[in-house]
């Protein structure tokens, strides 16, 4: 059994702290800001055991060196082996399907999710999915390196997980994503209801996360590019006939990239 706590960092990052109830271990996911982590550890008298990295962007990796230095270089650091990330001492290859982090209570299933970056991975520990910048609540990551087809496939992989799976993205982007999703689907009742709930949370400066796979399948247009109503709205917006799922996903991402 594991519990998960958000450590806010920068303007909108979450560094997720995983606590293993039985083994007593603690890992952080994507610690871009060492100070935020160290302050939290000190405040709560927690000893850190390791780090899980999803991809190479500095707001996810920038704290590795300082965290290692503050722990006598004894931290276990997992991450993709093909993203040139300094500080990883347990590299994960493209063939790896799971890892067993010491002092966690369960193995971590590994998902290879090219799109946001080519080597992006996610970790599933029990029913907790740490998906970095691939899947956001009501959205998905920008395509800095991969293709729309790769991201579409990566998201469809995650959509196959159990609907009760909890989703822990690395950013508090939910309200902005919901604004776009409501533009695409202004009659989606689940989306309208969730937007109201998220507004209440954010008005109190509370996280909108975690989400769940089941919820995302209802509110996230990037998980449903095949839906006829989404294709129809895309056809109207882009003044072209949108029939296949791949084109639908590509145009959704293009629309979001330019959405204000």
Curated annotation (Swiss-Prot):
TM segment ranges: none
Recorded superkingdom: Bacteria
Enzyme class: hydrolase
Pathway the protein takes part in: Secondary metabolite metabolism; methylglyoxal degradation; (R)-lactate from methylglyoxal: step 2/2
UniProt cofactor(s): Zn(2+)
Any one of the GO BP annotations: methylglyoxal catabolic process to D-lactate via S-lactoyl-glutathione
GO MF entry, a single one: metal ion binding
Keyword Metal-binding: yes
E.C. number: 3.1.2.6
Residues noted as binding Zn(2+) 1 in the record, renumbered to the chain: 55, 57, 116, 133
Cofactor: how and how many bound: Binds 2 Zn(2+) ions per subunit.
Keywords from the named record: Hydrolase, Metal-binding, Zinc
Subunit structure: Monomer.
HAMAP family according to UniProt: Glyoxalase_2 (MF_01374)
Purpose of the protein: Thiolesterase that catalyzes the hydrolysis of S-D-lactoyl-glutathione to form glutathione and D-lactic acid.
Similarity section: Belongs to the metallo-beta-lactamase superfamily. Glyoxalase II family.
Name of protein: Hydroxyacylglutathione hydrolase
């Amino acid at each position: 059994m594991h519990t998960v706590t958000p450590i806010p960092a920068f303007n909108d990052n979450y560094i997720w702290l995983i606590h293993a109830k039985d083994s007593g271990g603690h890992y952080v996911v994507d610690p871009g800001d060492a100070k935020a982590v160290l302050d939290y550890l000190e405040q709560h008298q927690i000893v850190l055991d390791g780090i899980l990295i999803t991809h190479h962007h500095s707001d996810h990796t920038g704290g590795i060196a300082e965290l290692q230095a503050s722990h006598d270089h004894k931290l276990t650091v997992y991450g993709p082996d093909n993203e040139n990330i300094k500080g990883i001492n347990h590299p994960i290859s493209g063939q790896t399907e799971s890892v067993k982090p010491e002092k966690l209570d369960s193995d971590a299933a590994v998902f290879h999710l090219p799109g946001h970056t080519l080597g992006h991975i996610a970790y599933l520990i029990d029913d907790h999915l740490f998906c970095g910048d691939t899947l956001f609540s009501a959205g998905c990551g920008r395509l800095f390196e991969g293709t729309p087809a790769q991201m579409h496939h990566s998201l469809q992989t995650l959509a196959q997980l159990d609907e009760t799976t909890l989703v822990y993205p690395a950013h508090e982007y939910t309200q902005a994503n919901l604004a776009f999703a409501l533009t695409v689907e202004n009659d989606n009742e689940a989306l309208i209801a969730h937007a109201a709930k998220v507004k209440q949370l954010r008005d109190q400066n509370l996280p909108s996360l975690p989400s769940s796979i089941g919820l995302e399948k209802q509110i996230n247009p990037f998980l449903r590019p095949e839906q006829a109503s989404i294709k129809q709205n895309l056809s109207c917006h882009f003044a072209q006939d949108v029939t296949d799922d791949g084109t639908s996903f590509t145009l959704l991402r293009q629309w979001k990239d330019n959405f204000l």
